[in-house]
Structure formats: C-alpha cells, structure tokens
Amino acid sequence: MYRLRGWLGWLLTILIILTLVGILAAGGMYYAISSKLPDIRNLKQVELQEPMYVYSHDGLLMAIFGEIRRYPVQIKEVPEQLKQAFLATEDARFYEHSGIDYKGIARAIWLLATTNEKRVPGGSTITQQVARQFFLNSEYSYKRKLAEILLARKIESQLKKDEILELYLNKSFFGNRAYGIAAAAEFYYGKKLNELNLDEMASLAGIPKFPSSGNPITNPARARERRDLYVLQRMVDLNFITQDQANAAKAIPMHAKPHEPPVQVYAPYAAEMVRQEMIAKYGGAALNKGYHVTTTIDGTLQMAAETSVRNGLALYEHRHRWRGAEQHIEVDANADTATLAAHLSGISSQGGMFPVIVARTTPEGSAVVVRSDRSELTLPPAAARWTGTPLNKLLKRGDVVRVRPGEKWGEWTLEQLPSAQSTLVSLDANNGALRALVGGFSFTANKFNRATQARRQPGSSFKPFVYSAALEKGFNPASIVPDAPVIFRDRRGHTWSPQNDDGKFQGPMRIRDALVQSRNLVSVRLLDAIGVDFARNYITQFGFEENEIPPNLSMSLGTASLTPLSIARGYAVFANGGFRIDPWLIDEIHDREHKLIFKNTPKVACRSCTSANTNVTQSTSQLVDGFNFGAPTKTEPSKPVKNNNEPPQTIPSPDPNTPMAPRAIDERVVFQLVSMMRDVVLRGTATAARSLNRQDIAGKTGSTNEHRDAWFSGFGGPYVTTVWVGRDDFQSLGYREYGGKAALPIWIEYMRTALKDKPIARNVPPQGMTQTTLNGATEWVKNEDINHLQDHDFKLHEEESDEQTFDIF
C-alpha cells in the first residue's frame, strides 16, 4: 500500500509539473503570438482592392481595369434573405457567439489529432474567416489557428456584428476574379443584390467553400449539389425559409453565365492610354484602388470615329480585289449547325466584322452562314456585289469569312479583314482635349496605337507648316513662285530632282493656288527661299521637336516621321488663331469615396488675351539663303484698298484663373493660311468636303511615295481632326489611293457628326493687315510687307532652260 501511494504521489507530481509546463508553454505561445498580432483598428479604415473605372466626358463607361472584380457594398444594401443564406452556410450562430465556436474548435482539434487528415472542417466562424482573410495565410497549423482565435476575439471586441459581416461579404473570393458578393452577383447573374432570386442567393452562398472548382460556371453540377443539399436545406432547418420555398428554388436549373459590365463607349485605345498614364502617375497599384477616371472623350464623337474608320477601311477593301476566304475547314456533309459553329471557337470579332462559316450556297447566288452562337444568317446576292462575283461562285461549304451588319436592320454584307489600317484623332482646338481617338481597325487584333505611336511621313499635309514659315518671311498668298523643274546638288555631287505627283509643271503660279493644287515644286522652292534652318526653327512653334524635322529641302514634301496626334496638334494652331495647345486625355480623377483628387487645368487658346501673345517669331522681309529665280515681276501692287485697324472680333475671355496657351505664330499668318486651306476644300484636292455644307471647313490632303500613306488633316467649328490610312508593313495602298480618296471620306463622315449644330467658325482678318491687289488677286497682307511685295515675286528668265542646277549649300 505504501508503495502504491508512492507511485500515485510521483504520478500526481508529474501531472502537476506537466500541467504547469503546459500552462507555461501555452502562456508563452499566447504571449509570443498575441504580441505580434496586427492592429485590429485598421479594419475600420480598410481599403479593399477595387478596379479602376474609366469614363467618357459625358459619364459613359469606357473600360474597367484591375486584377479583380469588386464592388464594395454596405451591409444595409444586402437583402435579409441573402444574409441568411450565408449565415446558414457558414455560421448559423454568428449573432450569438463572441467570435469563437468552441464546440467546432474542439471537433477540429480532435480530428487533427486522431486522423491523418491535414485539413478538417469545423471551428471557423465568420469572424475567424475575416481574421484569416485580412491578416493570416491559409496554412493549416495549431499556431495559425491560435492566432486566428485571438484575432477573432479582438475583432469582436472592436467591431459590431454587422461590420464584421460586411467585411466578410466584401472580402470573400467567389471565383472568376470576383471578390465580394456584389461582384459575384453581377458576374454570375448580371444582377444587383436586390434583384437576386432565392436559388441565386443560395448558389452564391455555396461558392466561397470551393470558389475555383465549385462555382456555377466551372462546375455547375457540383454547385447545384451544394445549393440544393446543403445551403437551401440548412436555411429550412434554421427556419429562414419554408420547405416549399426550398423545393421551388431547387427546381430551377443552374443558369449562371459570365456577365461583364457593359462598355457604353468603345474607345479601347484611349482607355489603354489612360491606364498607362495612371500607372505612371500613381504606380501599379492605381489599378486596384478604385479610382474613377473621367476623360475628355465625347461618347457620341467616339462612336462616330469608330464607325467612320471601319466604314472607310471597308470601302478601301471594296475598291480592291476579294482575297478569298479567311480559312477553309473540311467539314462532314452531315455536320449540323452546332458542329459548324464549334469551328469558330477562338476566332474573335474584329472591328465589327463577325466570323461565320459557310453552311451552303444556293443556285440563286445567296449563302447560308453560321455564327459562333449557332445562329444562321442568309446572305443575299447583294451582300457580295462589291466583289463582282456571285456568292455561289465565291464561297463554298466550310469557308470561314467575315460579315458585318448592313445599313438596314437584319441586313448583312460580306467583308474581309482590311489589309490597311487607319487612325483618327480629333481635338478641341482651343484647349487640346481629345474628343475622339481611334488607334487602328481592331484593338483585339493589335493593340499598337497608331495615333500616338506610329511615325509616318505626312506628305503634303505637312505643307501648311512650310507655307506658314514663308508667309512669316514676307511671302503672301498672291506671291508668284514657278512650278518648274529644278535639280539640287549637294557638295558630294548627289542630285535631287523633286517632281509633282502628276509629272507636269504649270510654270509661275500664286502660292495660294500652289497649296490648293498641292504642287511639290513650289513647296520646295519656297523652303529653299526662306532657308531650311529658319523653317525648322519656325515649325517647332507648332509643337514639333526640331530633331523630328529633316534638315534638308525634302522637309517641304513631308518626309518627317510624325505621329497623327502631333499633326493634329500642329493643325490646332491654325484652327485656334495661332496658339500652341497640349493634347490631354484625363479630365478628373475621383477616389473610391468619389472625392475629387485631380482636376486638369489645360492651357487655353484665347484670341482676346494679350498676355498670351508671347514667343512669336519676329517678322522680317529679308530673304535668307535664297536663290535668284529670275527678274522680279513688272507687276506693281495696286493701291491698298483697306487697312484693317478695326478692333478684332469680340471673343469672350475665359476665367482669369485659366492658364493661357502660348502664342505660336502670328495671328495674321494664321488668317492667311486658314483662307488658303479653305480654298483647298472649295476648289482643290479636298472638294469632297464641300458636302458638309459649311464655310469653315479647311484642311490639306497628304500622300507619300508609292501611296504608302494617305492623310487628311483639317478643322471646322471647334474641332481639328487628322485621319491617316496606311499599312503597317509600309507597302503601297494601291493605285491612286491618295489622301483625298482613302482618308478624306473617313474625315467627312466623322465631321458630319462632330459638327452637327456647331456654329460656323469665323476667319476675320486681324489688326495689322491691309487688303491689296497683286498679280490679279486681292489678298490680305501684313502691313509691314506692303512695301516688299516684289521681293517675293519671281518668274523664270525666258532665256533659261527648263532645268537649272543649284548648289544647296
């Protein structure tokens, strides 16, 4: 007996020691873990990741950027039945416990100790899940579980139950990049929370357990099983719903499918520009902070721009041959519609052109085609009229081709993806706001933004910049310059003999007519007369970098490599009275709380603001680096008929706090150039633009060697717009694909919408000009040039040959 008591004493002592050690170990672990726990107060100001939203100037959605989908909601916005579905699924006693389900924890510990399972159910309340989601990782261990318990207790002590549930519903992952209940409801069902049905609520409540492998899109069978056998039945057991309600919900088939927020304004190139600018401004996290970015893009004008570019490129293709089917697939003779449609998987729509596969053709010349959604379309014979070949001879079963909607409802036309590309840039000439931008035919096919990244030769559309330099030097629209052959030779003996596009020469002509008819030799002679160095320096006033402009006479023919956006910016100087504006795209930025954190204040052109009249190239009547083109004309200028000393046109001044754009060129030169470019439309290479029936349309066509590039840049009303058409591989667009043929129709179609209801822009001669008659034409000239008109009037010596060699150095 004594020995037994001794053993019991030793056993008791050991137990006491082990208990003390356990208590000390637990205390040490508690202290070690609790001392490292994060501050729970951060949950009160937590910033959940949200995507970045991009809007047009008129408030229409352009794009959503970000790695996740999330739309945080307040708990009061969550329907009661939806809350009950989550409580029944995750934590039925949520509003009763203090954050810990001790019975569940005991069960989890027992299973971990007695089984080989590393992951066991039970023990995690909604509060614990919030602790894990915000502060811990997903590792299964005693240490993490203890930290989770301690954090849950702290959370319960500082947050209300509804605040905890709100965090849980907004933080939980629902698969397919959807975080939070609102994003899940929109993605899977395209609904707001208050629009959900009971079966949809139950389906959503069942997702967080298996968000990737058990969501209703990835695995609808598994999702339905969890909805019917667990979520709905638990709601019945807890008296949240009746059995009849559950049965009715169970009878509804799974119907979830992807729903993306509808983009209201298709402007992918502009949206991508915003994305890049936001990252540059705020770093990569900008895409996850819930910023709301308002741009300068006008929704109506952007739609018109996209449509115009697509129509213009389609017409370009119609002028050239049918290249054949995009691809041909050998299909079984008995293949049904679904089988045919399956062959279109992975072939995306581009530029409004949809892929279809030919099912059959008819002797009457029509064709039945199948779309990727398994719908059938019947193409009438007229759908391929532009090809000159009946559909039954053009297509065969298994051909994959493109179609796009016609002008009438239900009408479709046969198309082919264009071999050319096009870009359109439209600015508010007075402040540089980008109102429309199309960077190419299809952003889906190629994200290269030709409006801002493509450097192409502008051809004759560059001539107005050279002409403005000549007018600054003392030339005037009536000055005579010969359109005649000339050869330039450098010091190494290399020669350059510029030619007109038509290979002909018209002899002495007024420079107004030379610009209207786009005579290359006159442009070259003008540049040679004023000097390349002067012209390069002067043209930088339009916003170009001097190193972008060739340091030789070829500059006059538009051989610089420039972006369409930079050309539009340069033309804005003509459109706004001579001020250099900066193109801009982001207008406002609001944070997730809709607080304004950025507002753009662009520099504005102001013709009535004298403070802006700075940085003007000074006028002089002396020629620099010129050549003797012959004796001056005997024609004397007539007596001036009018001196314009009247006050300038009254233009409302902007807010005095508005920054003013710097003056780039003399407003008198602007007046002369605008008048000349309006003549380009009235009687020159852009007469098609007369169809707009406006007196303020001005611009210039442009083409390059072998028709590699086609341009039209011009302005009217408040807008300046540049259109470019060309091929990315720099191949020719084809015979006679000039700017007036390939680019101008796009410009006209767009401007018809842009200028609707816009007032006519006036071109009033400013102060310091005199109207006089010279060489049979009445022109406005600068007052200081009146006594030097003959200095800039040349004609060829009759005894000189048609070609004359000059040393350009």
Curated annotation (Swiss-Prot):
It comes from Xylella fastidiosa (strain 9a5c). The gene is mrcA. InterPro entries: Beta-lactam/transpept-like, Glyco_trans_51, Glycosyltr_51/Transpeptidase, Lysozyme-like_dom_sf, PBP_transglycosylase, PCB_OB, PCN-bd_Tpept. It is found in: Cell inner membrane. NCBIfam families: PBP_1a_fam. Residues 1-5 are cytoplasmic. Residues 624-661 are annotated as: Disordered. One of its GO terms (molecular function) is serine-type D-Ala-D-Ala carboxypeptidase activity. Keywords: Antibiotic resistance, Carboxypeptidase, Cell inner membrane, Cell membrane, Cell shape, Cell wall biogenesis/degradation, Glycosyltransferase, Hydrolase, Membrane, Multifunctional enzyme, Peptidoglycan synthesis, Protease, Signal-anchor, Transferase, Transmembrane, Transmembrane helix. Cell wall formation. Synthesis of cross-linked peptidoglycan from the lipid intermediates. The enzyme has a penicillin-insensitive transglycosylase N-terminal domain (formation of linear glycan strands) and a penicillin-sensitive transpeptidase C-terminal domain (cross-linking of the peptide subunits). Its EC number is 2.4.99.28, 3.4.16.4. This is Penicillin-binding protein 1A. Residues 52-221 are annotated as: Transglycosylase. It comes from the Bacteria. The active site is at E90, S460. GO terms for cellular component: outer membrane-bounded periplasmic space; plasma membrane. Residues 27-809 are periplasmic. The chain crosses the membrane at residues 6-26. GO terms for biological process: cell wall organization; peptidoglycan biosynthetic process; proteolysis; regulation of cell shape; response to antibiotic.
